[in-house]
Amino acid sequence: CKRESFKDCVKHAHPDLNPDFIFLSPAYNMRSSEINAVLGLSQIKKLDKNNKKRRDNFDYFLSKLDNNKYITDFNNAGQSNYALIIILKPGAAIEQRDNVEKLLDRHSIEFRRGLSGGGNQLRQPYIEKYGLEKTEDQLKTDFANVEHVHNYSWYVGNYPTLERDKIDTLVNLLNNV
C-alpha cells in the first residue's frame, strides 16, 4: 500500500467485492432520528398503498422475466420488496453475468450486485477480525448458494411510482441478454 491510497489498496486487495461496499469493520446503520421520525410519520398514511404497489411491481416483473435464464419462483407471501431481484440460474457463465452488468450500465440502469450491501459477508475484510474467514474452496462448497447470489444476482430499485413501461423495458433488456 505504499504507492496507493488506502482506498485503492483495499480495493485491490478485495477484487471480488464491489468497491462501493467493502466493510473493514462491522457497522451499525445509524441515521438521524428526529428528521426520519417526521418523514416516517408523514408516510405512514401511504404505507398500505405503497406496499401494494411494490408487491404488484415485483409480481409483474417476475411474471415477465425469462424463467429459463433467471430464478423467478420466489415465495412472495407478505413481502413488499424495495427491489426487483434478478438472479441468473445456477450454471450461468461468468460472461453472461458480465453481459447483464454491461447492459444495465449501457442503459443507465442503477443496480447493485449481490443483493444487499456487500454481497457474501464472509468475503468482507472485517470477518478476519473474528477468525471466520473461509478459503475459496469452503466458500464454493459450504456456502454455494450465498456464493451464487454474491456473483450472479442484482437488485434494481422498486418504488411506488415505478411505471410499468420501465419494468417492461428492463425485462426486455434482461430477457434478450
Predicted regions mapped to residue ranges:
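PLP-dependent aminotransferase class I/II
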Residues: 1-177
